[in-house]
UniProtKB/Swiss-Prot annotation:
It comes from Thermotoga neapolitana (strain ATCC 49049 / DSM 4359 / NBRC 107923 / NS-E). Belongs to the universal ribosomal protein uS7 family. It holds the Pfam family Ribosomal_S7. Part of the 30S ribosomal subunit. Contacts proteins S9 and S11. This is Small ribosomal subunit protein uS7.
Length: 155
């Protein structure tokens, strides 16, 4: 057991928008520590969003993340030789990180176009409550709803 709870690291805000959420997105997009490339991708995606939607890309991104955030998820719990999928509420920091992760994964899964275009498309889709990331959230909620009978196994 730990002596005390591990502290959450503070992520410095990104240089262009001065926003922690955008910094988290950049860190999720980043591969092999290549942050400059990740920043170009994210800011390029934001430019595309600004161009296509004629709205502040930061507000669009914030709303997209808000739309993708899951409320419930299932966690496996072993009880007497059987493993049950127990629905539990998702804590706020995990909600945000899951939402960003799902948006980036959905963008990466698309094929044949530059990443900034795919990311912009996925953020706009999430803003409009459509797209792969929203589908992932709905699937997670459906799983939790289906396993509602095991909710009393929560810990």
């Amino acid at each position: 057991m730990r002596r005390r709870r591990a502290e959450r690291r503070q992520i410095p805000p990104d240089p262009v928008y001065g926003d922690v959420l955008v910094a988290k997105l950049i860190n999720k997009v980043m591969w092999d520590g290549k942050k400059t490339i990740a920043q170009k991708i994210v800011y390029g995606a934001f430019d595309i969003i600004k161009e296509k939607m004629k709205k502040d890309p930061l507000e669009v991104f914030r709303q997209a993340v808000e739309n993708v955030k899951p409320v419930l998820e299932v966690r496996p719990r072993r009880v007497g030789g059987a493993t049950y999928q127990v629905p539990i509420e998702v804590q706020e920091p995990r909600r945000t990180s899951l939402a960003i992760r799902w948006i980036v994964e959905a963008a990466r899964a698309k094929k044949g176009r530059p990443m900034k275009e795919k990311l912009a498309e996925e953020i706009m889709a999430a803003y409009n409550n459509t797209g792969t990331a929203i589908k992932k959230k709905e699937d997670t909620h459906r799983m939790a709803e289906a396993n509602r009978a095991f909710a009393h196994y929560r810990w």
